[in-house]
Regions:
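N-terminal Rossmann NAD(P)H-binding glycine-rich loop of SDR-like oxidoreductase domains
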Residues: 3-23
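A generic structural motif
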Residues: 23-27, 134-135
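C-terminal substrate-binding/catalytic lobe of Rossmann-fold NAD(P)-dependent oxidoreductases
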Residues: 116, 131-198
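Conserved beta-strand positions in the Rossmann-like core of class I SAM-dependent methyltransferases
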Residues: 4, 28, 137
Length: 198
C-alpha cells in the first residue's frame, strides 16, 4: 500500500517507517522541514489543509505519529477528505484510557503537570475523530512507552489501561509500530480506538 506518514523522523514515526518498509509498503514521509528518514520525504505543514492534501493525495492511508500540541485534528481530517485518502491511522496516547470506572489516566492522581498539555491535546484529537465521518483508527499505547525490542507479541484492548500481572503497563515503540501496521493490513478497529500492552 501507499502510506503517507506524518512524523516519519520521530521516535515512533521512524519505527513505523521501518516496519512499513520491511513489510513492502511504499512510504512517503510528510514534514515541515526536510529530514533524513530513509524514506521519500515531502515537505508540507500538517496544519495547512491544502498543502497536506496535496502531499497525501494518491495514498491508501495516512498515519499520524506527531505531537498533538502541534497538530489540529480538524485540519488533518479535512486534508484526508480533500485528498480522497480512505484511511487515517493515528498513534495516540494513554492519557485518555480509563484506569477506573469514569476515571481517565489524565485525571488520575500523579499525572505529571508537564505532560498535561500533550495529553489534553491528544484527548481532544480523539474526540474530534469520534465526531467525524472518516474511517479512522486511534491506537493508544500502554502507560510506559519507549524504545525497546520488537517482540511481535502484544495484547489488544479497548478504552481501559491494561496492566500485566506485576501491575505494569508497558509497550515498546517497535511493537506499537507492528500493531499499527497489523491494523493497516487487517483492519479490525475502523472508527474506533484500541489499546495495546504486554
Amino acid at each position: 500500500m501507499k502510506v503517507a506518514l506524518i512524523g516519519a523522523s520521530g521516535k515512533v514515526g521512524g519505527r513505523l517507517a521501518a516496519e512499513l518498509t520491511a513489510r513492502g509498503h511504499q512510504v512517503t514521509g510528510v514534514a515541515r522541514q526536510p529530514a533524513e528518514t530513509g524514506v521519500v520525504m515531502v515537505v508540507a505543514d500538517a496544519n495547512d489543509r491544502g498543502a497536506l492534501a496535496a502531499a497525501i493525495r494518491g495514498s491508501d492511508a495516512l498515519m499520524v505519529a506527531g505531537r498533538f500540541v502541534s497538530m489540529d485534528a480538524a485540519t488533518i481530517l479535512g486534508a484526508v477528505a480533500d485528498a480522497g485518502v480512505p484511511r487515517l491511522l493515528v498513534v495516540g496516547g494513554a492519557g485518555s484510557l480509563f484506569v477506573a470506572p469514569g476515571l481517565q489516566l489524565i485525571d488520575a492522581p500523579g499525572m505529571p503537570a508537564e505532560f498535561l498539555p500533550e495529553v489534553s491535546a491528544g484527548k481532544r484529537f480523539l474526540e474530534t475523530l469520534q465526531a467525524s465521518d472518516a474511517d479512522w483508527t486511534f491506537l493508544s499505547p500502554a502507560a510506559q512507552f519507549g524504545p525497546g525490542e520488537r517482540t511481535g507479541l502484544y495484547r489488544v484492548g479497548g478504552d481501559d489501561l491494561m496492566r500485566d500481572a506485576q501491575g505494569e503497563s508497558r509497550i515498546s515503540y517497535e511493537d506499537l509500530a507492528k500493531a499499527l501496521v497489523d491494523e493497516l493490513e487487517e483492519p479490525r478497529h475502523s472508527r474506533k480506538r484500541f489499546s495495546i500492552a504486554y
